[in-house]
Amino acid sequence: MKFTEKSVTTQLEILKRKLGGELFEEIKLDDTAFTGGVCKAGSPIAADGKVDKETKPIGILITDVYKDENPNGTILRAFGVVNSANIQTSTGEAVADAVKTALPLIVFE
């Protein structure tokens, strides 16, 4: 019998509250979005699939995305409440004011 053993860890929940009306969108991440083969949940993502912490992000990545497994991710575009503390823990950085300004339909708590 063949099998593959894989270690799985849990990740922090980026959504603080699930309201039921969130606008999610699938997006293919650019190769530059990955650091060490992973793009961390909570990263602000631009329309071209790159991490964009300053200019024009269109959403927040909901879960970690692994380049080797599947370079596609899901972003929250609007009508959601995210946990800023969990984003900072996941990405290693606080959410920039420019990101909050660019995403007015997402509440950062």
Features from the language model and the residues they span:
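Surface-exposed, low-hydrophobicity beta-strand/loop segments enriched in small/polar/acidic residues
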Residues: 1-109
